[in-house]
From Swiss-Prot:
Forms pores that allow passive diffusion of small molecules across the outer membrane. This is Outer membrane protein U. The keyword Repeat does not apply. GO terms for cellular component: cell outer membrane; pore complex. GO terms for molecular function: porin activity. Keywords: Cell outer membrane, Ion transport, Membrane, Porin, Signal, Transmembrane, Transmembrane beta strand, Transport. InterPro entries: Gram-neg_bact_OMP, Gram_neg_porin_domain, Porin_dom_sf. Homotrimer. It is a multi-pass membrane protein. The lineage of its organism: Bacteria, Pseudomonadati, Pseudomonadota, Gammaproteobacteria, Vibrionales. The gene is ompU.
Amino acid sequence: MKKTLIALSVSAAAMATGVNAAELYNQDGTSLEMGGRAEARLSMKDGDAQDNSRIRLNFLGTQAINDNLYGVGFWEGEFTTNEQGGVDGDVNKDSSNLDTRYAYAGLGGAWGEFTYGKNEGALGVITDFTDIMAYHGNSAADKLAVADRSDNMMSYKGQFENLSVKASYRFADRKLNDAGTEYTDNGQDGYSLSAIYAVADTGLELGAGYADQDEANEYMLAASYTMGDLYFAGIFTDGEKAKTEGDYTGYELAGAYTLGQTVFTTTYNNAETNNETSANNFAVDASYYFKPNFRGYVSYNFNLIDSGDKLGKVGGNTTASKADAEDELALGLRYDF
């Protein structure tokens, strides 16, 4: 029973981070695993190159407490570079280029897993329906911070046969008032909920989610269908990013086809913010898997917004610049460990 519960925890963490973990220690109910990725990413816009390479490293620890309960702790960081011709110096981050993506601990069992710290909100599993590309995509189903990765958050997830559920609540952050005499909060509390149901063995999955934070809210509906080597999915989202001039509506469509060691994917993304287009693009990519944990890919995003178009923005619309209208080519190599 203990091994089964811990295996569920490991599997859930692996799905959330896309890792192939290596076991560092496993004895007397205590286990520690390390995983991550090294990814070289070259971005080209208007003939100009940018290095978007990154390294992700994570550690997952589990401790069997009894036959029905385990403890879990997880951390993941991302290292990036932005030296722009310098040597060992990041121009934007004062040479500190480590971001913490996850940092949480909690308890789990057959009833699910409860954690506190920096973890995912409930809408990430919904956007995953169409967020399938190696580089591009996922530009129309925006998530509120409380529904994305955020700190100071309690999270729950559970799997019950064909139904998976997630819920999160983020506390408002404590801060001193301007006079420094008493504590108040920043008003960034909120919650998110989601559920995904797999319809028997049909290949059909349905998902729905909702999030609310401060004066913003959103809901999402998603569906996917898998048939052999083919995959199709779609998402619709609607809500308010702000109390005024913040109406938001978006949808994404995605498809994938696996041919031997090559996976072809494509997505279309369209969104409106404040009644004007804020995203409109079509992307295609191809990934070749030399081995299950090593791939190369090429990805191209066709930006369907033209320079001079009205561009939707929260708080007031703008006009699309030449940079806003550029296509993008990305080339990458990714090693998972």
